């Protein structure tokens, strides 16, 4: 199951991999409760317990800070069911995409020091291997645009498991193969984990230090985050929550070629204090590693409007929402095998809320809403009103008249080019043919915010993609008599390994009837 926020490239949320589990695991259990919990949170505690039981979630850790003070921290369930280790507020959870605000914070330190200019091309800070401009000029893919997912980089994730032979390629290889400008820079917000792999590479190259070491000494330690690290740092192994799949099986440890977008672990206690720093609630022992004006800049949307999602944007490492049930919010979520996380900031209310889990069950947003509603009654009322309205479900795909007919072109992989054709019929069927493979139909088609999306059965023939079974995902934009964008090879939910993009360009066949 894949959850998208609007556009297919706006969010990445993944399900889990297979593993091994014994038949004598402890049942879901609530970790030792604090001596006293603010009575406002009883409804949220009940909602968490119910969700854990219904979805068989091994553990949940939460934290809330209001007006510069932590007012609730609690953990429920098992950090490691096999070892019978209970979760606590100091348990390290894999954060997935909440890694991005941390990485952006580190990058902004270098900006403040005058070592990086946000408005210079990202290529200026790379080595011999550069981003390749295909749909637009690579020099327009600035550092600011990479941070805000508007550089035109492709949809991308690439997982490497410890129980498998393959390991992550070097960043130069990933950039050579997938560092493609597939949308004109600045045109649209299209989420790219690869972009944050490039950011962590820029941090390492500019600072002259390994990304993980730079994060530790320049962000985690100055902010007093003792239970936060890139991957699981030395001495923190016993604190780390095991990641579990949907069948409650432990998932082997994995890493990526986009560490800056996905590789950070943190406890609920540390993460809420990171949120407090971004709310300018600087704790006595925390160093002011960024100016308040820099924090403000990070929290301002830097993306073009998304017509289907008014008020939604992306700043420098943070998602921004002008109206989240009556309040302006700055937040990030994370989802990947065995991970579902959320960190939300409500600056006008000086409120930070954290929800961390060690499985993916798709209910973290509901937990977050329940907790925020306990603190902000008007927010809770607005959430209830939304549920009562029951917005209509999207109707079946209807082809845009501008798409009707036949289109022909190529898909450019890092290895070669393949012929590619699409025919849009009046009955809404979409026929595609890639290379010499059989013609097939596109499923789950949609056309929204100027982008055509859908999925079809065919194959990309590069060696890295050929390792696992996959289907192909379309993400194309209509530009006059051209369709340009991405064809993305993506592995299935029960074997999450990659989403790897190739550039596609087609022109309308003038002789089509």
Task: Give residue spans per PLM region.
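Short, surface-exposed loop or secondary-structure junction motifs
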Residues: 76, 80, 134-337, 341-342
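Bacterial N-terminal signal peptides
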Residues: 10-26
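Short, glycine/proline-biased beta-turn/loop segments that scaffold the active-site neighborhood
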Residues: 118-134, 223
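Short, conserved catalytic-motif segment at the N-terminal edge
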Residues: 35-95, 115-117, 131-132, 168, ...
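Active-site SXXK
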Residues: 42-48, 62, 68, 92-122, ...
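Short, well-ordered beta-strand elements
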Residues: 342-345, 349-359
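Short, gly/Ser/Thr-rich active-site loops of penicillin-recognizing serine hydrolases
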Residues: 356-419, 490-493, 498-513
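Central antiparallel beta-sheet cores of small beta-barrel/beta-sandwich binding domains
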Residues: 408-473, 498
